[in-house]
């Protein structure tokens, strides 16, 4: 038996190699294989959003004006979700709903599914871009792992939550005021602020902001005074290899302030990565729970006592009444097709009224 030793040579004109060479070439804007997913999806998502907020009404889906053409501004314009009657239809332009009619497709809310799906794949493409570049320059993939947090939140809020409900109608519309209304909806129908996963998300995001501020200030405070420039930006050569701040001094300072301090940079920066990403993942898990209508904390004993004793009230019972008011107002406004009528006697009243 003969064993051939040596490197296997492929045809130099192999199509894959030609594509790989062109896609991964060093240029001003790196393309890469991930760019085949990222750039088209990001282009279509942004293009669909700009088109919808500029021209497309929400009269047929929500009974609202939602475009610049109708008098909205940047804060009130939105690409609105499809009507509740369309359930979870993908609303393809060539599908049975629009039948290739672009105007009808826009009226039905087709731009929302278009933006949501292309946006999700665009974000995934951006994460793959970070993986690809990290591999090319031999870095660890922690940037891509960190970016999984925002992707998890986007997918859970815009896709998984409405999939758990009766249709895309209950997802957020793509607009500033529309997102605010969705937040109020989450509070009224799910008591979201009392959900422990939301609490972890808030702790992660605000904790990360605090860590960022502390870290930036500490590094600025402990910069070496070895430059000749008039300020921080001119004092150092951007390509210098040596360290420009003192970790030892920073450790001594925070040890005196708190009694404890990070002893090395790896643990410090891993903690700065861990806090926000874990918070985002926890909030995404919480939204998945809401998609299934899971309850969070219900302090029933306080509700019963407040109902029996006019003089007993807690911040929790006040918030529950507020949630009932949100539901009574929003349900009738957002779902007129349900013909919801709430008589005066069933509307919530606090013990003080």
UniProtKB/Swiss-Prot annotation:
Pfam families: Photo_RC. Its EC number is 1.10.3.9. It is found in: Plastid, Chloroplast thylakoid membrane. The chain crosses the membrane at residues 41-61, 125-141, 153-166, 208-228, 279-295. Chlorophyll a PD2 binds at residue 198. InterPro entries: D1/D2, Photo_II_D1/D2_sf, Photo_RC_L/M, Photo_RC_L/M_CS, PSII_PsbD/D2. The keyword Plastid applies. A plastoquinone binds at residues 215, 262. The modification N-acetylthreonine is found at residue 2. Chlorophyll a ChlzD2 binds at residue 118. NCBIfam families: psbD. This is Photosystem II D2 protein. It comes from Populus trichocarpa.
């Amino acid at each position: 038996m003969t064993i051939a030793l040596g490197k296997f040579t492929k045809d130099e004109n192999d199509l894959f190699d030609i594509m790989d060479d062109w896609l991964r070439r060093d240029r001003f804007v790196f393309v890469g294989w991930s760019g085949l997913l990222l750039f088209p999806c990001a282009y279509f998502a942004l293009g669909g959003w700009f088109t919808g907020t500029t021209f497309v009404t929400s009269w047929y889906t929500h009974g609202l004006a939602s475009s610049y053409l109708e008098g909205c501004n940047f804060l009130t314009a939105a690409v609105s979700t499809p009507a509740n009657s369309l359930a979870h239809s993908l609303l393809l332009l060539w599908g049975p709903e629009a039948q290739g009619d672009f105007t009808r497709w826009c009226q039905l809310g087709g731009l929302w599914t278009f933006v949501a799906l292309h946006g999700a794949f665009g974000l995934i493409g951006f994460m793959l871009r970070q993986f690809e570049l990290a591999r090319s320059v031999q870095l660890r993939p922690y940037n891509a792992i960190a970016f999984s947090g925002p992707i998890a939140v986007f997918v859970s809020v815009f896709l998984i939550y409405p999939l758990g409900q009766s249709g895309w109608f209950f997802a957020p519309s793509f607009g500033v005021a529309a997102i605010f209304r969705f937040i109020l909806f989450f509070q009224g129908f799910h008591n979201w602020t009392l959900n422990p996963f939301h609490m972890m998300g808030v702790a992660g995001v605000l904790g990360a902001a605090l860590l960022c501020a502390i870290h930036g200030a500490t590094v600025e405070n402990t910069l070496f005074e070895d430059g000749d420039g008039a300020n921080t930006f001119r004092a150092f050569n951007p390509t210098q290899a040596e360290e420009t701040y003192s970790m030892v001094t920073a450790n001594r300072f925070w040890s005196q302030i708190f009694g404890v301090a990070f002893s090395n940079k790896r643990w410090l920066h891993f903690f700065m990565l861990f806090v926000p990403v874990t918070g985002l993942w926890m909030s995404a898990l919480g939204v998945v729970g809401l998609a299934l209508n899971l309850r969070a904390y219900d302090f029933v004993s306080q509700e019963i006592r407040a109902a029996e004793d006019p003089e007993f009230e807690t911040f929790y019972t006040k918030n529950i009444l507020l949630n009932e008011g949100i539901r009574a107002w929003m349900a009738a406004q957002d779902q007129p097709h349900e013909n919801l009528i709430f008589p005066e006697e069933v509307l919530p009243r606090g013990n003080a009224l």
